[in-house]
A protein has these predicted regions:
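Basic- and aromatic-enriched surface patches that contact anionic nucleotides/nucleic acids
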Residues: 1-211
Length: 211
């Protein structure tokens, strides 16, 4: 099996266009939004996130994808043996695709903190995907000030210092507009730092994977 060097954006596109398929034996998508948040935090910091194991070729025994896919093109598919959770998460966030998990189809909405600390802050809470967004909102807002990524909540989504990650990757929101919304100007040390951070965030698309 030959080695392929791909990027996070390549994997997301391959998942969305149907050229990466799941063998029937693979379990479905099970990651919570909090797991996706942790993946993107690792990508942002350049941490290792593993390899993607595939088998080149077609199979009639494939599982339905957790995201919407067209009919795969003949002769252009890979069977995804290991890495399904990561690849589906990449497609969901980088392309803004909805995912089917726990019998529900919904987007995975992450927010990026323009004012995050440079150091990693130890986790002292976890978002519960099954709770209503308004529940414990005050506690979450206070606890997330030191975080880089969080699962979106209603109150944080209304704060311009927290940027919707999928909107940034799908170009629904430009970095300069996001910074202007947050600081009212592009001409300040805070604005310069925020622009640098958003460019670093967008560089996740070029994160290298071995497949």
């Amino acid at each position: 099996m030959r080695r392929l060097d791909v990027t996070a954006a390549d994997l997301a596109r391959m998942k969305a266009n149907g050229s990466l398929e799941l063998p029937e034996m693979q379990r479905g998508y099970v990651w919570t939004a909090s797991r996706v948040r942790d993946l993107f935090d690792s990508l942002y910091r350049g941490y290792p996130t593993g390899v993607i194991l595939v088998w080149e070729g077609e199979s009639s025994h494939v599982r339905r994808s957790a995201i919407q896919q067209p009919v795969p093109r003949p002769g252009a598919s890979y069977l995804l043996l290991d890495g399904q959770q990561r690849v589906t998460s990449l497609a969901a966030v980088l392309l803004g695709e909805k995912v089917r998990v726990r019998n529900r189809t919904r987007p995975i909405e992450l927010l990026f903190n323009l004012e995050h600390p440079e150091e990693v802050v130890a986790e002292d809470f976890d978002e519960d995907d099954d709770k209503e967004p308004e529940e414990e909102e005050d506690r979450l807002v206070a606890a997330t000030r030191g975080k880089t990524f969080v699962v979106a909540t209603t109150r944080l989504a209304d704060d311009p210092r927290w940027v919707n990650v999928s909107k940034l990757f799908t170009d629904a929101l430009r970095p300069r507009d996001a910074v202007r919304n947050a600081y009212g100007t592009l001409d300040s040390p805070e604005a310069d730092r925020a622009l640098d951070r958003l460019e670093k965030l967008r560089a996740i698309r070029d994160y290298p994977y071995i497949m």
